[in-house]
Amino acid sequence: MTNRVLVIASGNAGKIREFSNLLQELPLQVNPQPDGIQVEETGITFRDNALLKARAVAEATGHWALADDSGLSVDALGGAPGVYSARYANSDPERIERLLKELGDRTDRQARFSAALCIAAPDGSVLAAVEGYCEGSITFSARGTQGFGYDPVFEVKNSGLTFAEMTQDHKKQHGHRGRAFALLKPELEKLLENDPGQDAGATPIP
């Protein structure tokens, strides 16, 4: 029996690499999202947007789809950028520049990354949905060359390192996606045990 196909519902190369690394131990054929799929992120929470993306990509491809919606919430900015993290500016450097400019020289720089993960089937049913968090703070300047997005300016609590200064294994252990995936993995393993190689629906999760 061939391994089940799981499509990563993202066009972000950094996310695809990170999820491929997280999923490498499971009996899955991990595929990137095909070109041309656009999903409007109209949800008001990270979970809402993850559900929208997973359902849309699963329906479009005919395979299970794993989506995440993640973002950075900064206390001193009232939780911004939040669900608008990816739309805060046009590119990663511009998003970081805007964030640092808005924080200025404030000393209250507490922040957290959130990640909602969702797996959906082609019929629109939700097979699993979890959320993970990582506490930290915003640095005064970018540090490190690994990662993507806000990684260079987010220092993980009690680590002394930004995400961009961590190895993939270190980030897997401490990062919000890694923590969310730790919750998702046993659910995904159970799904694969019960239905390893054919697409099927499931009882929807509200």
From Swiss-Prot:
Keywords: Hydrolase, Magnesium, Metal-binding, Nucleotide metabolism, Nucleotide-binding. GO terms for cellular component: cytosol. Mg(2+) binds at residues 40, 69. Binds 1 Mg(2+) ion per subunit. Substrate binds at residues 10-15, 70, 148-151, 171, 176-177. InterPro entries: dITP/XTP_pyrophosphatase, ITPase-like_fam, RdgB/HAM1. The keyword Oxidoreductase does not apply. The keyword RNA-binding does not apply. Pyrophosphatase that catalyzes the hydrolysis of nucleoside triphosphates to their monophosphate derivatives, with a high preference for the non-canonical purine nucleotides XTP (xanthosine triphosphate), dITP (deoxyinosine triphosphate) and ITP. Seems to function as a house-cleaning enzyme that removes non-canonical purine nucleotides from the nucleotide pool, thus preventing their incorporation into DNA/RNA and avoiding chromosomal lesions. This is dITP/XTP pyrophosphatase. It comes from Synechococcus sp. (strain CC9311).
